[in-house]
């Protein structure tokens, strides 16, 4: 099996296929990973608390105006798993356990597929994602609120993965390709000049410049949590207060 994409869906499917005894080749994209639990608390507990801090005007989830590049709105959510009560997913461990990692799928010619260079860079990005972007928010919340939590017990895992430039799918015995590269949105049915160059509606926390037209659940509508369950309710409450 060739699985293309390492957001949450691709990583979870690759893990399940491996556990079922399948030989899996996983095409790695530019996506982070996060521990399922940090300092004794589930990641979604942290997300919910940080979303509440944001709603109260304190330092919580990063807001859309803090993104260094608007293209960051399209970055996939960091991967982890909820299976069996939830656990971490580490691509380097996948490789050590038999999953064959390759770079981002770059093209195909018949049964031969090509992969872009930069596999190690993508793995390093995934490894650093939590410590660079999310852990500081958790630690700031602990310091501000005096939470009494156990120490960080994560252990580093080092494993070198060789770079692969191309594969012959027939020779490798690949019988199926799973595309888990995400999906896009299309607001083409709204014929109004309120969208930016990337197709996102221009709003102030969901409220557009057109009277009566608001949006909910869009990526980074207000902050990192706007497109998932930990943040959409807070955005919905804000919109309801505007009417």
Where are these regions (language model features)?
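Flavin (primarily FAD) cofactor-binding/catalytic cores of flavoenzymes
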Residues: 1-243
């Amino acid at each position: 099996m060739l699985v293309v994409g390492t957001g949450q869906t691709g990583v979870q499917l690759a893990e399940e296929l491996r556990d079922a005894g399948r030989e899996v080749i996983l095409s790695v994209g530019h996506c982070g990973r996060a521990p399922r639990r940090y300092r004794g608390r589930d990641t979604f507990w942290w997300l919910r608390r940080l979303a509440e801090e944001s709603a109260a005007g304190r330092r919580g989830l990063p807001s859309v105006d803090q993104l260094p590049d608007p293209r960051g709105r399209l970055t996939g959510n960091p991967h982890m798993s909820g299976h069996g009560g939830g656990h971490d997913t580490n691509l380097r461990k996948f490789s050590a356990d038999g999953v064959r990692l390759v770079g981002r799928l770059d093209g195909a010619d018949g049964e031969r597929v090509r992969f872009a260079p930069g596999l190690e860079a993508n793995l390093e990005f995934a490894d650093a994602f939590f410590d660079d972007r999310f852990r500081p928010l958790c630690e700031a919340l602990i310091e501000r609120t005096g939470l009494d939590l156990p120490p960080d017990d994560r252990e580093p895992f080092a494993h070198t993965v060789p770079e692969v430039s191309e594969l012959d799918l027939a020779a490798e015995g690949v019988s199926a390709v799973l595309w888990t590269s995400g999906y896009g949105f299309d607001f083409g049915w709204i014929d109004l000049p309120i969208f930016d160059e990337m197709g996102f509606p221009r709003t102030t926390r969901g409220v557009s410049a057109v009277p009566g037209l608001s949006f909910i659940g869009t990526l980074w509508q207000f902050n990192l949590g706007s497109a998932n369950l930990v943040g959409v309710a807070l955005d919905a409450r804000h919109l309801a207060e505007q009417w």
